[in-house]
A protein has these predicted regions:
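Conserved ABC transporter NBD signature motif
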Residues: 73-83, 92-94, 128
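Conserved Walker
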Residues: 58-59
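Helix-to-loop junction immediately C-terminal to a conserved catalytic motif
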Residues: 65
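The feature captures the beta-strand-to-loop junction immediately N-terminal to the Walker
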Residues: 50-52
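Q-loop/switch helix immediately C-terminal to the Walker
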Residues: 102, 108-121
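ABC nucleotide-binding domain signature
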Residues: 48, 91-103
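Conserved structural motif at the start of ABC-family nucleotide-binding domains
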Residues: 19-21, 34
Length: 133
């Protein structure tokens, strides 16, 4: 696994974790991608995930945002276990998202489907969303 490194930019005494991963494990096609990963991200911290290609850095972000669901473990955001939250609910309620390093669209969707997917994250009211796309 890559190295998880935290950089503190300000000191906030007594702050609770904003994002907490507990014992996250993920396997895919008999390959263990993440194995028992746990860490807290507190207010005022910046988190850097360092490591070579293929060790699971992007996978961790995909799990936090709800794009992937781990086989085991908990994801706590603002003291709520969000493991079963849909992507749209997680994104809108907690104002959390992820922009991948290689483009920000889904290759297997049409342009309109991509816009609707982003719209679902940003605009909960379907009538308003559809009128804008």
């Amino acid at each position: 696994m890559g190295i998880i490194k935290k950089f503190r930019i300000k000191s906030f005494k007594g702050t609770k974790p904003i994002i907490k991963l507990e014992k996250i494990s993920l396997s895919f096609k008999k390959r263990q991608i993440l194995d028992n990963i746990s860490f807290n991200l507190n207010q005022g911290q910046i988190l850097g995930l360092l490591g070579p290609n293929g060790v699971g850095k992007s996978t961790i972000f995909n799990i936090i945002t709800g794009l992937l669901k781990p086989n085991y473990g908990s994801i706590i955001i603002d003291n709520e276990n969000v493991i079963n939250y849909p992507i749209a609910s997680r994104s809108s309620k907690f104002k959390i998202g992820y922009v991948p390093q290689y483009g920000g669209y889904f290759h297997d969707l049409t342009l309109i489907e991509n816009l609707k997917a982003i719209g679902e994250i940003q605009i909960e009211d379907m009538k308003i969303r559809n009128s804008r796309i």
